[in-house]
Curated annotation (Swiss-Prot):
InterPro entries found in the cross-reference section: Cyt_P450, Cyt_P450_CS, Cyt_P450_E_grp-I, Cyt_P450_sf
Protein's name according to its UniProt entry: Abscisic acid 8'-hydroxylase 4
Chain's role: Involved in the oxidative degradation of abscisic acid, but not in the isomerization of the produced 8'-hydroxyabscisic acid (8'-OH-ABA) to (-)-phaseic acid (PA).
Reactions the enzyme catalyzes: 2-cis-(+)-abscisate + reduced [NADPH--hemoprotein reductase] + O2 = (+)-8'-hydroxyabscisate + oxidized [NADPH--hemoprotein reductase] + H2O + H(+)
Family, as annotated: Belongs to the cytochrome P450 family.
Residues given in the record as heme binding sites: 415
Residue intervals passing through the bilayer: 4-24
Gene Ontology BP terms: abscisic acid catabolic process
Pathway note: Plant hormone degradation; abscisic acid degradation
Organism ancestry: Eukaryota, Viridiplantae, Streptophyta, Embryophyta, Tracheophyta
PROSITE patterns documented for this protein: CYTOCHROME_P450
Amino acid sequence: MAEIWFLVVPILILCLLLVRVIVSKKKKNSRGKLPPGSMGWPYLGETLQLYSQNPNVFFTSKQKRYGEIFKTRILGYPCVMLASPEAARFVLVTHAHMFKPTYPRSKEKLIGPSALFFHQGDYHSHIRKLVQSSFYPETIRKLIPDIEHIALSSLQSWANMPIVSTYQEMKKFAFDVGILAIFGHLESSYKEILKHNYNIVDKGYNSFPMSLPGTSYHKALMARKQLKTIVSEIICERREKRALQTDFLGHLLNFKNEKGRVLTQEQIADNIIGVLFAAQDTTASCLTWILKYLHDDQKLLEAVKAEQKAIYEENSREKKPLTWRQTRNMPLTHKVIVESLRMASIISFTFREAVVDVEYKGYLIPKGWKVMPLFRNIHHNPKYFSNPEVFDPSRFEVNPKPNTFMPFGSGVHACPGNELAKLQILIFLHHLVSNFRWEVKGGEKGIQYSPFPIPQNGLPATFRRHSL
C-alpha cells in the first residue's frame, strides 16, 4: 500500500501543477493584451522624451503612431494614455469606481492629505457638496460688487507699471477672489500673511522634492505649516463669533455628517488650501491666454468691446455695478472664454490609477497602472473641432458633441468651482475692455509650462487707461 501511495502522490502533485499552469494561462489570455506603445528605458521610460519637448507634441505624435489608446512609462510609472471622448468618459464617469485620483506624495504634503481631490467615497462626496454649495449661482452672485472692486484695483495698479507680467498679476487677482470666496471679508493682516506663505508654497510645488534646508521644497513645507497655523487662528476667531457665514469656511465649519461628526481643523485647513490651489493658476492661465488671443485678433476685440459697451452704457458708464443678469448676457465674451479654454487646454490631462485590472476595448489596463485621459488631444482633434489650431469662438454657437469638451474635467472629480471661475473672468474682461488698452511686448512666441501652459514669459504687456 505504501508503495502505491509513493507512486500516486507525485502523479497527483504533477496533475495539480499542470491544472494550475493551464488555468493561469487561460486567465492570462482572458485578461486581454496591453495597449500598443513603447515603455522606453528601464525605470525612466520615456520621461526624457516628454520633458525635452512640448508635451503636446509628444502626446500627439504618440497618438498618430499608436492610436487613441497607448502605453508608455513616465517618471517610473507604467501609464495608459487615452485620447478619445469615449475613453475619457469610461475612466471619469461610467467606470470611475475602478480608478482613483493619484498625485505624487510630495504634492499631497504641500496641499494637505485631507484635501478634496485626493479622496473618493463618502468623504469626497461630502466635501464636494460643500464646495458646490459655496459656489452655487445663488451664492456667488452676491460677490459681484467685491469681484468688481478687486478687478478695478488690479487694473488701475497695472496702469502705473512700465511692464506687467500678465500671468503673475492674474495670479494675484485670482488669489484675491479665492480669498474672498473662502473667507469673505478677511482682515488685511491675515490676507497679507496668507499671500506671503502661499506664494512660497506655490514656488516649491513644482520644484524637486528634496527636503533639505534651503531648497525650494523645504521652504514650501515650512510655509505650509505656517498656512495651517494662520487658518487655525481664523477658524478659532470665527467659532468665537458664532456668526453664520455662507462663504466656504462657513460651510466647512457648519458641516455635520449623518453621525453628527464635524470636520477637524486639519481637514478644514487642507480643503481651504486645496481650493486656493485649484482656483489660482488655472484661472490666471485662462485670463492670460484670453488677453493674448484678443490682442492678436483686433476685429474680434472690437466685437467684444461693442458687446461690453452696451452694458457699460446701461450702467451709466459704470456708475452702477454689474448685475448677475448682465453677466449672463455676454454671449460673445462667453464664447471667447470657452474657445480659449479649448485652444489653450489648460488642464491638458488628468491622472488616475486603476484599482483593479480593467479591460477597455480589448486592451488590459493592469491594476496599479496610471491612466491619463488626454483632454488636449481631444480638444484639438479635427474629428470634433474643425480647424482645431484656429482660434474661432463662433464654433461654440453650436454645442460640441458629448464628452469632446472637458475644460474642467468630468465626472465626480470635475472642478466644482467652474461657475466662480467663469464669473470672475467675465467681470474682469468687462472692466478691461471698457477702461483699458493693452499692448503685448516682446516678440517671443510659444508656450511655457509652469506647470500649466501660458504664453512665453507670462505675456509681458503694458496697460493704459482708455474709456469706451
